[in-house]
Regions:
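Charged boundary/loop elements
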Residues: 1-187
Length: 187
């Protein structure tokens, strides 16, 4: 680097030469090329607990440890059946939206909260269904709806895990689970 001792030093900010420094230009420079995830706001801007948000983030990316994921990673021979209905494969989509028990919980929850939302059907995927239902709400109501969705999928996951790890066949029925979720939401 050659320096000219006869000229005065000057300060400039390469991200935005018109100004000396701005946090906004630094942020933009650091995030250049960052991937935009359209569903991130659904999760991270909700009122749900952090552990529930983290679970939802993993669930929509199919990164929760269901038996199909363990089988894909060679941790078990083959996927096992859903621990709730014993009919379909134990995977994230089935546990959270496609299982008969999950549908009953969604229906009960929406009725209890008087929410006008469609219950997921057999072909729905969590993220697609969630984004479609979310689009029906006003800007202010979306945050509340997102919180309800996250709370319900967290409760369904906890019910599934109680059966898997506690080896119990007892589970809360849909009204009991919905009541439990509503109680947690009020806290």
């Amino acid at each position: 680097v050659e320096r000219d001792a006869s000229s005065q030093d000057s300060f400039s900010w390469p991200a935005d030469p018109s100004v000396l420094y701005m946090a906004r230009s630094t942020y933009k420079r650091l995030c250049l090329g960052a991937v935009s995830v359209p569903y991130a706001i659904c999760i991270w801007k909700s009122w749900a607990l952090l552990k529930c948000k983290i679970f939802a983030w993993l669930a929509v990316q199919h990164r929760i440890w269901t038996s199909d994921r363990r089988a894909r990673h060679g941790l078990q021979d083959r996927p096992s059946a859903c621990y709730t209905c014993l009919k379909e494969e134990d995977n994230a989509e089935h546990i959270l939206v496609q299982c008969v028990y999950a549908k009953e919980v969604w229906h009960t929850m929406f009725d209890a909260l008087s929410l006008q939302a469609n219950i997921p059907d057999a072909q729905d995927h969590l993220l697609g269904w969630w984004l479609a239902q979310r689009a029906r709400w006003s800007r202010d109501a979306k945050r509340g709806f997102n919180t309800v969705v996250i709370a319900v999928i967290w409760a369904l996951w906890k019910q599934r895990n109680a059966r898997v790890f506690n080896r119990t066949n007892q589970q809360l029925n849909a009204p009991e689970l919905a009541s439990s979720v509503i109680g947690e939401l009020k806290e």
